[in-house]
Regions:
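Structural motif
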Residues: 171-175, 200-207, 307-317, 346, ...
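A short glycine/serine-rich beta->alpha loop
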Residues: 95-101, 198-202, 225-229, 307-311
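Short helix-capping/linker segments at secondary-structure and domain boundaries
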Residues: 120, 219-226, 326-337
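Short connector loops at secondary-structure junctions
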Residues: 126-139, 260-263
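Divalent metal-coordination and catalytic microenvironments
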Residues: 102, 155, 232, 267, ...
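N-terminal catalytic cores of NTP/NDP-binding nucleotidyl/phosphoryl-transfer enzymes
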Residues: 59-132, 227-229
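Divalent-metal (Mg2+/Mn2+/Ca2+)-assisted nucleotide/phosphate chemistry catalytic cores
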Residues: 135, 140-257
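Non-catalytic terminal extensions that flank enzyme cores
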Residues: 1-95, 165, 241-293, 299-302, ...
């Protein structure tokens, strides 16, 4: 097993600053990602790592890597070494079910699919229905169950390999993992979860116990686990990295993304609770266009004359940032828009229309694939090659 410096020194998961706050449940303010790397004790993805991944991917690096959307990591270099040495690795990610998935929820799954396609590895997707129920006092068990089903249909539509992907709900699979959950829970004390997650006397005991459940999938195989996720999820894996080797497993490796900003501005991250700041996977084309034209924060000037003269600030312009984040993978086209918009040659309305067209194309393709998701659901959860093996296993 490998021990990397810096794990013990990493700051608590509740990261606050005078300008921004990042926890697994809340992101506010304009995030300084350089400062967050230092606070969390992670590493920036180097050009050398990108070159390695580009070589493995036959020169086709994913847009979210090329543009530093996935920007930080823990032990990604060791994952790549294991892959080159023939040891392999596996992928693990998850979803806390909500009553409506938006594009910010889907983006990490799109990147995860690329990883599975390039490396040909198994993927485990945990649906944390138990955690969602315990954390949200206004959710019933029935609501969480329906949200989980709908979210799984959206995840299936991303196009993962059904024989190398296992999607499971905690509430169903708990009997297969509970022996290992208890071993993990025994190694974590209340002081650790309180300092990591900011729990207080009002926190229910389910939430205090839950981190032990979320750690288990990192131990599904006797290989290194790579977790693609937004950087706000890092605190869970610091706990895992503290205890994994004592149980005979590898420390989890991670690759972290930046947040897709809400329509309202570049501060914080998109939230399902604010309808006008998010674009949902179910939004029809006219609603998508209306949201972008009406609500997307612009870095352009207030009049056409000023825009022609001064240009836009693309660093705070949400339509441009969304194009850059994922929704236009043509680097030369994005740079053309950056140049013409920032110089005043392009107007705000023109950039918004480009985004609306790109985003509606993305969502239209997703909806077409989702129509076939119900017939694939059983294979991902129960009858696919990996799923069948997983239901036969008990983790002790």
């Amino acid at each position: 097993m490998d021990t990397k410096p810096g794990d013990a020194e990493a700051k608590p998961g509740k990261t606050e600053d005078s300008d921004f706050k990042v926890t697994p449940w809340e992101v506010t303010g304009k995030v300084d990602y350089d400062k967050l790397i230092k606070r969390f004790g992670t590493q920036r993805i180097s050009s050398a790592i990108k070159r390695d991944m580009e070589k493995i991917a036959d020169g086709k690096l994913h847009v979210m890597l090329r543009r530093d959307i996935f920007f930080s990591h823990r032990d990604l270099d060791l994952v790549l070494k294991d892959y080159r040495d023939g040891k392999g690795f596996f992928l693990y990610t998850g979803r806390g079910p909500s009553l409506g998935m938006h594009i910010g929820h889907l983006a990490p799954f799109v990147f995860t699919k690329w990883l599975q396609d390039v490396f040909g590895v198994n993927l485990y997707i945990e649906i944390t229905d138990d955690e969602k129920f315990m954390r949200n006092s206004d959710y019933t068990i029935e609501q969480v169950g329906e949200a989980a089903r709908q979210n799984i249909l959206d995840i299936v539509a991303v196009g993962f390999d059904p024989d190398k992907t296992f999607i499971f709900k905690d509430s169903e699979y708990i009997k297969n993992i509970y022996p290992l959950v208890t071993k993990i829970a025994k190694k974590i004390n209340f002081s650790q979860v309180r300092s990591t997650f900011g729990f207080d006397p009002s926190t229910n005991i389910g939430m205090i116990f839950y981190p032990a459940i979320q750690i288990v999938p990192t131990m599904f195989e006797n290989k290194r686990c790579l977790i693609p996720a937004a950087i706000d999820q890092d605190p869970y894996w610091r706990l895992q990295r503290d205890l994994a080797e004592s149980l005979g497993y590898y420390k989890a490796a991670e690759i972290h993304s930046k947040f897709l900003p809400p329509l309202s501005g570049i501060e914080g991250k998109m939230s399902s609770s604010t309808a006008d700041s998010a674009v949902y996977l179910t939004d029809p084309p006219e609603i998508v266009e209306n949201k972008i034209m009406k609500y997307a924060f612009s870095g352009g000037q207030s009049t056409v004359e000023e825009q022609r003269r001064l240009g836009a600030n693309v660093d705070v312009d949400v339509p441009f940032q969304w194009l850059y984040y994922l929704f236009d993978d043509d680097d030369s086209e994005v740079e053309r828009i950056r140049s013409e918009y920032s110089s005043g040659k392009m107007l705000t309305g023109e950039v918004k229309k480009v985004l609306a067209e790109k985003l509606n194309g993305f969502l239209g393709e997703h909806r077409r694939r989702r129509e076939k998701s119900p017939e694939m659901l059983d294979k991902f959860m129960y009858s696919g090659e990996l799923a069948k093996r997983m239901w036969r296993r008990i983790y002790e």
